[in-house]
């Protein structure tokens, strides 16, 4: 799959750069390897992903760089085009062999699944890494944890590799995608990507412990002043997929005024008002969703943002 790096069109930006020659596109990734910021057992994903056993959790692989530029991103230390070594000193370059071993190590630590966070731009490394790990004893579901800024073609390449899609749907309009993530086409491409995900994995399947072993979880982080958009997204999802997917409606927006560009969006300098989230939660409740997660409380503290 290295040819996918020589003219990179893995995400909707279709930069077309030759990463094998050391050229970087929008995301900043180069070479034929994956850059991994951290591997860990993660206890704070949705319960059907992380489980409730304190000795287990989701076997999470955090990849460096990102195809979006979310102005409110909590992980800017590892998501930027150029990484700051002082803030992310432990980033490792991994080929398919070393990445497959990382998956096996997480399985040995008791992970419920292998959770690939921000993986889009490393797809040509991930697919053979999963295959190699399975040849060497990996028996866990593979979770593709994505921003939703994907092409249907890239998702199609993951058929047979991914069991669970954990996918954001961030925005309802092109204007919001452009303003907050430098992605005016986000609201267009995400729906085609989700449709391909559903074509592959179908309705949710749970094991006897309530752990998801196949299916789709759609996340939506409710942003300040965007409750209308949140309801539109949830409504469209329900109209198309009904109770065949898991809905995760998040109330954890955290203002980070120190992030570059944040001052241009005063609405994002405030936490989500409780009544805004309640409006969205009430709308979801009226739909009688069978599989849905709602969050109580307020924005997460910066102390919960990982140290890289």
Predicted region positions:
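Conserved radical SAM core fold
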Residues: 79, 123, 148-151, 169-187, ...
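Conserved Radical SAM active-site core
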Residues: 27-160, 164, 173
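Auxiliary Fe-S-binding modules of radical SAM enzymes
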Residues: 1-23, 202-308
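Short glycine-enriched, charge-decorated loop/helix-capping segments at active-site entrances
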Residues: 77-91, 179-184, 262-271
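Non-cysteine beta-strand/loop elements that form the S-adenosyl-L-methionine
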Residues: 159-174, 246-252
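Hydrophobic faces of well-ordered beta-strands that scaffold small-molecule active sites
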Residues: 59, 114, 142-144, 165-167, ...
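Anionic-ligand binding region
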Residues: 177-209
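Conserved glycine-rich "GG(E/T)P / GGGxP" loop and the immediately following alpha-helix
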Residues: 107-132, 179, 185, 195, ...
């Amino acid at each position: 799959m290295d040819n996918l790096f020589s003219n990179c069109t893995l995400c909707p930006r279709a930069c077309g750069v030759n990463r094998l020659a050391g050229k970087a596109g929008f995301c900043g990734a180069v070479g034929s390897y994956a850059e991994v910021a951290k591997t860990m057992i993660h206890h704070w994903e949705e319960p059907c992903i992380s489980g409730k056993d304190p000795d287990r959790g989701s076997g999470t692989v955090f990849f460096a760089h990102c195809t979006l530029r979310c102005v409110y991103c909590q992980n800017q230390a590892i998501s930027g085009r150029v990484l700051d070594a002082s803030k992310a000193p432990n980033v490792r370059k991994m080929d398919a062999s070393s990445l497959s071993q990382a998956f096996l190590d997480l399985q040995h630590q008791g992970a419920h699944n292998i959770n690939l966070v921000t993986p889009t731009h490393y797809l040509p490394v991930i697919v053979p890494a999963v295959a190699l790990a399975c040849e060497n004893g990996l028996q866990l579901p593979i979770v593709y944890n994505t921003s939703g800024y994907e092409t249907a073609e890239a998702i199609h390449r993951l058929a047979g590799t991914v069991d669970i899609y954990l996918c954001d749907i961030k925005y309802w309009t092109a204007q919001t995608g452009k303003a907050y993530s430098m992605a005016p086409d986000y609201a267009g491409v995400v729906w085609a990507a989700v449709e391909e995900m559903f074509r592959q994995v179908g309705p949710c399947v749970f094991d006897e412990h309530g752990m998801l072993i196949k299916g789709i979880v759609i996340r939506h982080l409710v942003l300040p002043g965007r409750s209308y958009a949140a309801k539109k997204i949830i409504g469209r999802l329900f109209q198309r997929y009904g109770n065949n997917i898991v809905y995760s409606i998040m109330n954890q927006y955290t203002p980070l005024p120190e992030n570059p560009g944040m001052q241009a969006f005063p609405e994002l300098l405030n936490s989500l008002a409780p009544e805004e989230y309640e409006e969205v939660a009430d709308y979801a409740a009226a739909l009688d969703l069978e599989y849905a997660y709602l969050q109580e409380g307020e924005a997460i503290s910066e102390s919960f943002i990982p140290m890289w």
